[in-house]
């Protein structure tokens, strides 16, 4: 469903703007180093220091999947259709990266999608979604480490429609995929990268190097 708004003013040409959108999962406002000295999050702290920190921002729905759909559509859950952690998006939804594609952007999604669990009988939950030229994801919550599933197979990631085994700690692996995308993409087009981490969603497992940090 397209909801249009009139442009308010002229902006810098789209070809001059590259965007990296990073989402962490289930991370409270006080689980950030610049908000709580007990916590060590140097990279997020740097983003806050060099960017803007919105101190009074709220989500419209306190659930994972509806919030993810709102980010991509700009709509309330009763409009985009993702009313819980199982419902799929309405088929007529337009995700904002689709508009970026129309404007000449190269777009990529890397990480946790987690929308449409109820549609698992008709499609793979990690299938590439509209609006993205490059795709890396996994079904549902995913796994922090390579895990043997109930069918006896090891869990996999969907990389542009091809299923490959997860190799290591998921935060590091998703970050590596993002770095690879940025280093290999053509510089002739602007890009939008949506890096959607699984961490620090419960049940949280740290990387081995951080296992005894606290």
Where are the language model's segments positioned?
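Formylglycine-dependent sulfatase
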Residues: 2-214
């Amino acid at each position: 469903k397209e909801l249009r708004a009139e442009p308010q003013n002229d902006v810098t040409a789209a070809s001059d703007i590259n965007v990296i959108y990073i989402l962490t999962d289930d991370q409270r406002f006080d689980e950030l180093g610049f908000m709580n000295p007990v916590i060590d999050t140097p990279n997020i702290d740097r983003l806050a220091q060099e960017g803007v920190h919105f101190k009074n921002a709220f989500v419209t729905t306190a659930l994972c999947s509806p919030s993810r759909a709102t980010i991509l559509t700009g709509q309330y859950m009763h409009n985009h259709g993702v009313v819980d952690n199982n419902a799929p998006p309405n088929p007529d939804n337009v995700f904002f990266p689709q508009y970026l594609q129309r404007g000449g952007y190269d777009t990529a999604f890397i990480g946790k999608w987690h929308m449409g669990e109820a549609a698992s009988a008709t499609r793979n939950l990690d299938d590439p979604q509209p609006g993205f030229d490059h795709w890396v994801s996994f079904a549902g919550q995913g796994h922090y480490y390579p895990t043997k599933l109930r069918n006896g197979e090891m869990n996999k990631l969907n990389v542009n429609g091809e299923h490959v085994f997860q190799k290591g700690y998921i935060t590091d692996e998703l970050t590596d995929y993002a770095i690879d995308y940025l280093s290999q993409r053509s510089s002739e087009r602007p890009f939008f990268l949506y890096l959607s981490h699984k961490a620090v969603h419960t049940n949280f497992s740290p990387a081995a190097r951080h296992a005894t940090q606290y």
